[in-house]
């Protein structure tokens, strides 16, 4: 699992 991708997606989801 790419945590960076998840974190980036979460930031954009904000």
Curated annotation (Swiss-Prot):
It is found in: Secreted; Target cell membrane. One of its GO terms (cellular component) is other organism cell membrane. Expressed by the venom gland. The modification Leucine amide is found at residue 14. Its main location: secreted. GO terms for molecular function: toxin activity. Keywords: Amidation, G-protein coupled receptor impairing toxin, Mast cell degranulation, Membrane, Secreted, Target cell membrane, Target membrane, Toxin. Belongs to the MCD family. Mastoparan subfamily. Mast cell degranulating peptide. Activates G proteins (G(i) component), which in turn activates the cascade of molecular events cAMP-regulated, resulting in mast cell degranulation. This is Protopolybia-mastoparan-II.
């Amino acid at each position: 699992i790419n945590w960076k991708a998840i974190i980036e997606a979460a930031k954009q989801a904000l």
